[in-house]
Amino acid sequence: MGGVAKCYTLSLTLPKLDKDWLEQFSTSLKESSERFRVNLIGGDTTRGPLNITISMMGSIEINSSIKRSGARAGDDIYVTGSLGAAALCLKKINEGVKPSESELISLNKPIPRLELGSALRNIASSCIDISDGLEQDLSHILKSSNVGAIIYSDKLPLVNSVSNYVKDSNDWSL
């Protein structure tokens, strides 16, 4: 972590050609590419079950990346953004419940914190994206660094809909 994004490849598998979906996807991809100043340099398109794979490439100075294995006892843990909104949106969709507009944006237009990753390069002892969830991804850092952690659930940055869901269900699995 901590590098500068340069370019990416896209592998797209589609079950059928849906021109409206493809146009919306392409427009969003172009907007993101322009926002983060990265270019699509190649990839593949095939027919099959829906699968979208983006591989980002970048550069970083030698020996300056933020690794999973750098955490030390006594370090504080920080989370950027809010947790659970995209997962709650997907859960609602799968249950036939209409998600809010902000939940849809969290699911469909996640914001990678590329600039922050670069800015933390000489500050953070360890770093990871939490695309697999806080518990699972934090455990990667803890195992790699051979340390433990205490999480204070009342300090987690949750949007109101996620906070309400957790209070009502006591389900922290999002």
Regions found by a protein language model. Name each.
Residues 1-174:
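Helix-biased detector of long, well-ordered alpha-helical tracts
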